């Protein structure tokens, strides 16, 4: 080895050590500061589900003017170090990370945990995994996570093509194809778990869970927004949806938690699926929980009609005027993130490309910018400017 090569190797090792020590210092700093919720700047933040930090994707998101991202995770990256690495990757590219995952651990998904919602074998193990997940987020300086409490998954019956020619996920409660799915499992009627549960059981199980979560979330400095049932219904396949399918249930659930760290992730699309049975439209939900600083995240989505039969739509193509939601968010001074939700595919033929997402017919992993994301972000930004009363 030449003298020059030796010097280069030593330099490389020093640079590697700097990076490693920097990451360790950041992790330690985040951990020591975890008793306080990480600072999130005021104001509405329009972001996206970020996907993978590939060169093409990062460039596309920059071109769209995106700053804030909501990210996924896998069991392999579900550690404090893994979350910190994800955060650093995105921050190095100029983005800011609002949340990573909706609960993920060694056993897989920690979201819609049937063991927790229905008190099935393995409940305490799942809860401990979830608590560790929240601790890891806090140590990595991630301020937020979404949680959902459905016991038998998200229910759909297929996809339908809308009059404008794109396709959306749909649910027809009268269809024999209606079923719930989550984390690779399928749930069907008449009884998804062999018996009918009572509302009292569902409430007892929620209370047991949230009382364990609150002190950990507060210590970690992580806010948790609870997602509505998708779809809202009094009961599906023997499992009551009595908590997060209606306004009064949400109020009681947040009161039971009694913590500044527990609030609402309002998925507008899911809520609109329920229609009048929810007891409050999205604007009423926003005004109640937003005025109490209990509104942490918004999924901006519309649907064609309330149940018994709906199809997910573009935000300007459903039955609800989404500009009302934006105005309400401005009125309550919402300061969380809002993202386009369940973005359909545009610029392709759903009849020939399957699922309407433009995925078929091209090599796996090939990047394809979805025009729908650009369209939805443009709509959302225009609505926000109008709601804020800004003039050109």
Where do the model's predicted regions map?
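Active-site-proximal loop/turn and secondary-structure-junction residues that shape catalytic pockets
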Residues: 52-54, 75, 103-106, 149-153, ...
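A cross-family glycoside hydrolase active-site/sugar-binding cleft signature
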Residues: 47-51, 72, 98-101, 146-148, ...
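Short, acidic/polar
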Residues: 51-61, 83, 127-134, 281-288
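Structural motif corresponding to the early beta-alpha repeats
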Residues: 72-207, 218-219, 270, 335
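Histidine-acidic metal/acid-base catalytic patches
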Residues: 2-27, 40-43, 116, 135, ...
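C-terminal segment of N-terminal export signals and the immediately downstream linker at the start
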Residues: 30-52, 59, 68, 392
């Amino acid at each position: 080895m030449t003298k020059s090569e030796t010097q280069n190797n030593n330099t490389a090792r020093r640079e590697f050590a700097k990076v490693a020590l920097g990451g360790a210092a950041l992790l330690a700093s985040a951990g020591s500061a975890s008793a306080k919720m990480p600072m999130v700047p005021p104001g509405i933040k329009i972001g996206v589900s970020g996907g993978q930090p590939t060169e093409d994707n990062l460039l596309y998101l920059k071109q769209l003017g995106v700053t804030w991202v909501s990210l996924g995770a896998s069991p392999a990256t579900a550690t404090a170090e893994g979350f910190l690495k994800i955060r650093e990757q995105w921050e190095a590219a100029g983005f800011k990370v609002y949340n990573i995952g909706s609960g993920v651990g060694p056993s897989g998904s920690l979201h819609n945990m049937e063991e927790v919602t229905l008190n099935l074998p393995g409940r305490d193990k799942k809860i401990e995994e979830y608590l560790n997940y929240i601790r890891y987020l806090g140590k990595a300086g991630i301020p937020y996570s979404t949680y959902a409490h459905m016991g038998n998954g998200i229910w759909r019956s297929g996809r339908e093509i809308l009059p404008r020619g794109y396709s959306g996920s749909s649910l027809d409660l009268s269809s024999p194809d209606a079923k719930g799915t989550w984390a690779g499992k399928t749930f069907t009627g008449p009884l998804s778990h062999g018996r009918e549960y009572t509302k009292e059981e569902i409430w007892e199980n929620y209370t047991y869970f949230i009382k364990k979560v609150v002190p950990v979330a507060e210590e970690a400095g992580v806010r948790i927004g609870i997602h509505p049932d998708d779809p809202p219904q009094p009961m599906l396949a023997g499992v009551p949806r009595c908590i997060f399918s209606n306004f009064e249930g949400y109020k009681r659930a947040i009161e039971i938690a009694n913590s500044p760290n527990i609030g609402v992730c309002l998925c507008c699309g899911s809520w609109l699926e329920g229609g009048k049975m929810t007891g409050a439209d999205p604007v009423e939900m926003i005004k109640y929980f937003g005025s109490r600083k209990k509104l942490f995240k918004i999924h901006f989505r519309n649907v064609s009609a309330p149940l018994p039969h709906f199809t997910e739509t573009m935000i300007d193509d459903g039955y609800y005027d989404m500009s009302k939601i934006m105005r309400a968010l401005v009125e309550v001074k919402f300061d969380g993130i809002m993202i386009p939700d369940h973005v359909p595919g545009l610029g392709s033929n759903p009849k020939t490309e399957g699922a309407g997402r433009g995925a078929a017919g091209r090599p796996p992993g090939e990047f394809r910018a979805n025009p729908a994301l650009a369209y939805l972000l443009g709509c959302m930004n225009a609505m926000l400017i109008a709601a804020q009363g800004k003039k050109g």
